[in-house]
Structures are given as structure tokens and as C-alpha cells.
């Protein structure tokens, strides 16, 4: 009789404990998701494209970046070279097309490295997590090195993956990520560094661009060409590891001499451009123009 009463008391205690854990977990989840942005239209959070002035023949005279940002010219995914897409996935998120927005193995590996060092030395952000952080989080929260921020980022990434296709996510990411030198997105980056449209990039150029987002200032090919070249080699080796290219293709791309574009904001026909800018500013207002 006494043993039966003890077993019953134990089951009651376990039931209460499990209920408390479940309630605490639910409360923690509700606290984490409080204030998270809606995902009805991710494109609404994207950066505004630059204003452009053309001559009567359709030649670009000048590009006016939005204030506090930089050059930005979104393009469809099918206008981005396959090599650039593959280089980005190999470098930033090898399991992109298979993971649910977060990579559990990368998280565990990163957690172990951070635990061993006693500080955050390794990240585990997928492409979707990076998109969530850069597009949906405030600048203050974006750079927080806290568990709360990482959990909110993971929840957003999971929700994005449930709502959008992988190609839609990849296109948004490649159109929004920062490449340095005031270039946001692959089209602006291709124009900034190589003076050409992104669709015209070859493997060597694609690998160079794909390596920039990790640390645009450090890998800036204009100011740190040796760092940029070393980063390109890392990207090419990752592409080989993922089976996107052969070792011989990587070697030839690494040996290719790259030709960079001149200054970013050169103005053709400056007097005419400034005249047009003045007319547009009076007609549309500064905020709508930029």
C-alpha cells in the first residue's frame, strides 16, 4: 500500500514537472517571437533600387544610390550565372537546398567551438538566417552576439523556408547581401568591381564576388588584392569539394588575371546629370527620388 502511494506521488510529481517544463518552453517561445515581423512580402523589406539617369541612346550616365545605403540593382535569379550561385552556396551554406532554414550540424559544431574558446568564434548562419538577419532585424539587434538574437534569427529563417521556395530565398539573398564599396546585391557588385552585368561574369569573377560578403573590407580587391585572391582560392576549393567544378577548372580560374573596374561613381555628362537630378528633385521630392 505504501509502495503504491509512493509510486502515485512520483507520477504526480513527474506530471507536474513535465507540465511546468512545457509551460516554460511555451512562454519562452512566445517571448522570443513577440514583435517578429510578418513575412507576407519579404520584398517589401528589401532595399530601394538606385535611381539611374540615361541618355537618349539608353546609355547609363549616372547612378544615384539611396541615402545611407549604396548601389542596388535587383535582377532575377536566372540572370545570375550558375557559377555564382554555386560559389555562394558552397561558401555560405552547403546544405542550402536541403536544410529547413537552419543547419543543426553546423549549429552543434559552432556551439562546441564557442564553448571551448569561452567566446563566440564561429557562426553557423545559413543563407536563410543571414537573409532574416539583414532584412528583418534592426541594426541594433543584427549585431548582438546573444543567444536570444540567434534563436529569433533561427525562428525567422524557419518561417521563411516554410513560406518561400529555395530559389526565391537565394534570389533575395543575392540581391540584398553587401559586397563592400557601397555595392548591395550581385548586379551592383559586378558593376562595381568588374564594370559588367552579373550575367557576364565568368567562374573566376564569380568566385571572387562570392568570397566578399564574409568580410568586405578585409577581402576588398581594390585595397587588399592579396586577401581577395586568397579568399577566391578558398571559394574555388569549396566548389571542388561540393562537386560543382573540377580541380582543373579551379586551378585555371585561380590563375586567370582579373581586370577591375575604375572608380565607382564616375559621372558621364555631369552638367546634364545634375540638371536632370534637379528637375526630378523638384518634381518628385528628395525622398521619392532617392
Explain the meaning of each model-derived region.
Residues 1-54, 95, 115:
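N-terminal type II signal-anchor transmembrane helix
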Residues 9-13, 82-83, 149-153:
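Residue-level signature of transmembrane alpha-helical entry/exit and packing/kink sites
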Residues 25-26, 30, 119-290:
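Non-catalytic, structured segments within soluble enzyme domains
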Residues 32-83, 87:
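Terminal hydrophobic membrane-targeting helix
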Residues 45, 76-127, 185-187:
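Flexible, acidic/glycine-enriched loop-and-adjacent beta/alpha segments
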Residues 56, 64, 91-94, 176, ...:
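Residues immediately flanking
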Residues 63-73, 89, 113, 214-217, ...:
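Acidic/histidine-rich, surface-exposed loop or edge segments in extracytoplasmic proteins
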